[in-house]
């Protein structure tokens, strides 16, 4: 009896549901995020802007809230609420990575978001706040300071949108 050959390509470990490649991406994000935060804390005094270009400063600031310092002055409970939210998000993302491991752009996006979320969770647990230091501005108008974890979350979110647009266009 002849064995029939499958016409599909062999599945990669990511396609088989392995979390390892995606957790590796998240770990790289966490490492770069934490190393930059450690360096900034060692080099800069709190709140002192260091001009890099006419539109970009490095400045050590603490964010006790969420994005754009949302709920930063809420009295302390937000530390634990945003930590719990980050942990729940990480668990959901791990489930999605395991379930959709073969979808490279989707999983890359999720891995970036995972790394960013956990980078900020580490800050909340270790310091009670998130360390921010990237300050873009136009004259006197400053975008809220952020960090590499926030950047990874943003890039991941953009990739999710692009992946969905590509998927929808491909199904037409």
From Swiss-Prot:
Pathway: Protein modification; lipoprotein biosynthesis (signal peptide cleavage). It is an enzyme of class 3 (hydrolase). One of its GO terms (molecular function) is aspartic-type endopeptidase activity. Keywords: Aspartyl protease, Cell inner membrane, Cell membrane, Hydrolase, Membrane, Protease, Transmembrane, Transmembrane helix. It is a multi-pass membrane protein. The chain crosses the membrane at residues 12-32, 43-63, 77-97, 102-122, 142-162. It catalyses: Release of signal peptides from bacterial membrane prolipoproteins. Hydrolyzes -Xaa-Yaa-Zaa-|-(S,diacylglyceryl)Cys-, in which Xaa is hydrophobic (preferably Leu), and Yaa (Ala or Ser) and Zaa (Gly or Ala) have small, neutral side chains. It holds the Pfam family Peptidase_A8. The active site is at residues 132, 150. InterPro entries: Peptidase_A8 (IPR001872). Its EC number is 3.4.23.36. The keyword NADP does not apply. GO terms for cellular component: plasma membrane. It is found in: Cell inner membrane. The keyword Hydrolase applies. GO terms for biological process: proteolysis. This protein specifically catalyzes the removal of signal peptides from prolipoproteins. Belongs to the peptidase A8 family. This is Lipoprotein signal peptidase. It comes from Paraburkholderia phytofirmans (strain DSM 17436 / LMG 22146 / PsJN).
């Amino acid at each position: 009896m002849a064995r029939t050959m499958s016409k599909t390509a062999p599945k990669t470990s990511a396609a088989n549901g392995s979390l390892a490649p995606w957790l590796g991406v998240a770990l790289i994000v966490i490492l770069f995020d934490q190393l930059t935060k450690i360096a900034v804390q060692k080099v800069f005094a709190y709140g002192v802007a260091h001009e890099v270009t006419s539109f970009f400063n490095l400045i050590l600031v603490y964010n006790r809230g969420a994005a754009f310092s949302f709920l930063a002055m809420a009295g302390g409970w937000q530390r634990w609420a945003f930590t719990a939210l980050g942990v729940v998000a990480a668990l959901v993302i791990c489930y999605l990575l395991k379930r959709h491991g073969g979808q490279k752009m989707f999983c890359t996006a999720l891995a970036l978001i995972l790394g960013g979320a956990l980078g900020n969770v580490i800050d909340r647990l270790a310091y009670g706040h998130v360390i921010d230091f990237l300050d873009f501005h136009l004259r006197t108008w400053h975008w809220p300071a952020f960090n590499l974890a926030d950047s990874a979350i943003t890039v991941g979110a953009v990739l999710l949108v692009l992946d969905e647009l590509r998927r929808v266009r491909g199904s037409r």
